[in-house]
Swiss-Prot record:
It comes from the Eukaryota. GO terms for biological process: glycine biosynthetic process from serine; tetrahydrofolate interconversion. It comes from Candida glabrata (strain ATCC 2001 / BCRC 20586 / JCM 3761 / NBRC 0622 / NRRL Y-65 / CBS 138). This is Serine hydroxymethyltransferase, cytosolic. Keywords: Cytoplasm, One-carbon metabolism, Pyridoxal phosphate, Transferase. The modification N6-(pyridoxal phosphate)lysine is found at K248.
Amino acid sequence: MPYALSDKHLKMVSGHLSETDPEVEQIIKDEVDRQKHSIDLIASENFTTTSVFDALGTPLCNKYSEGYPGARYYGGNEHIDRIERLCQQRALEAFHVTPDRWGVNVQTLSGSPANLQVYQALMKPHERLMGLYLPDGGHLSHGYATENRKISAVSTYFESFPYRVNPETGIIDYDTLEKNAILYRPKILVAGTSAYCRLIDYKRMREIADKCGAYLMVDMAHISGLVAAGVIPSPFEYADIVTTTTHKSLRGPRGAMIFFRRGIRSVNQKTGKEIPYDLENPINFSVFPGHQGGPHNHTIAALATALKQAATPEFKEYQTQVLKNAKALENEFQTLGYRLVSNGTDSHMVLVSLREKGVDGARVEYVCEKINIALNKNSIPGDKSALVPGGVRIGAPAMTTRGMGEEDFHRIVRYIDQAVKFAEQTQSSLPKEANKLKDFKAKVDEIADQLAPLKKEIYDWTAEYPLAV
């Protein structure tokens, strides 16, 4: 049979991007060039591997597969089922748990939806949860709200009450958390962070959850790669549910996973009857059909590949170096006189206070971007505004992937110190009537040529390190 459509159509569906859409291809090339010639210090970012890219760009994205392996709402899913089952198997193996005690959903599309899907599975509207306060290092999806506004949609569906860090130490105040949890009696206690640099005491969190009758949910989105490698403690011994993204320290594609307990949850004190966990069906139902339709099968395949890599000695070597590089950040910043929230780090990142320097995170972030350093402004304990917060968050995973070591991270801190000093000088030069953030940015743009030599130095230096594409 002859091809029923035109030759132009055939060329459109079979031609490569360079032939069919050079405009988009050029933007992609520009972004690759930016990544190659920049220092990426955003703690939630990483550079994934070539084989993960190979799996992402496949015809698996053509297939609709609503439902779960063996129970789909569409035909033709024989191989999709194989991929999803393999991904689930590798997820359990990567985190050193067994299928008799744990199950995992690999269809959830991203971290914040994964958390919402867990809440909806286990709570009725307006039931209660507790999570770490956002300016103290928590995450929006743990129910953040201010006095005047519910910021996260989670806080409109459910009631949320934050716990805090000790303002003197920057460490979670577990004693106050316990007292408040016993009074508030949340249905879910969330142990997870986005800008908290110390290890969470999962054993203590488990004890608190038991005292108030809550499920303990651990959001390990930032640290899951470190957990898989076994270089920091695992939450699986203590948690009922564990959620994670897959593209941060785990170094996979953009996605998420929800792990849930199987087996016996408790034993009735009076009757001795065993009470099983009932998490698997509610969570799976919440993901599909509750919140999503068809899963992204190409992403699940790429995640399976990343999880295979996460179970290797080379991945443990990488995560060990991530911790060393984070310590290098800590040591060099402190040597240069900076204050770090919680006085340092146990993980992959540091949170640097800029209050003592007379500038804020938004201004330093802007200057850093002008010299090809990507980091992010971040709230620190005591902040009132997330738009002009008092700190910057700096992570080690991305540049460690590219092969940088401790001395390289010392050098990076010295670059940031130059950016901070430039921001200080620029801010102090502005008149009182025109010293807002927009005025600062305009002034930096006006004198950006002063930063050109430093930008060129960083541009050339970063090109020496490989970038998988």
